[in-house]
Amino acid sequence: MTRSLKKVPFVAHHLWKKIESLNIKKEKRVIITWSRASTIVPGMIGHTIAVYNGREHLPIYVTDRMVGHKLGEFVLTRTFRGHARKDKKSRR
């Protein structure tokens, strides 16, 4: 179910304060955050945000096509190692 149009998109307060201060200073710097649930808004375009995946912070460069999505959608938390092989050696 999508979020109601009456409500504003969720952006963590501490993250929004950092982005606003960088926009005022016209500065580009990597912003480190743990807030995977924050929605990408137009004020974030052009910034690099390092999002935590459970082990490390992975940098994401925000483009205009990402607006409306969550930060966590672009950083995977699980690594896929491949399916089990189908031969007799691997079953032993």
Curated annotation (Swiss-Prot):
Location in or out of the cell: Plastid, Chloroplast
Keyword Metal-binding found: no
PROSITE patterns reported in the protein's UniProt record: RIBOSOMAL_S19
A Pfam family this chain is assigned to: Ribosomal_S19
GO MF, one annotated term: rRNA binding
One annotated GO biological process: translation
Keywords, sorted A to Z: Chloroplast, Plastid, Ribonucleoprotein, Ribosomal protein, RNA-binding, rRNA-binding
Matches recorded under InterPro entries: Ribosomal_uS19, Ribosomal_uS19_bac-type, Ribosomal_uS19_CS, Ribosomal_uS19_SF
GO CC terms in record: chloroplast; mitochondrial small ribosomal subunit
PANTHER family: RIBOSOMAL PROTEIN S19P FAMILY MEMBER (PTHR11880), SMALL RIBOSOMAL SUBUNIT PROTEIN US19M (PTHR11880:SF8)
UniProt record similarity statement: Belongs to the universal ribosomal protein uS19 family.
Function: Protein S19 forms a complex with S13 that binds strongly to the 16S ribosomal RNA.
Name of the protein in its database record: Small ribosomal subunit protein uS19c
Organism field: Psilotum nudum (Whisk fern)
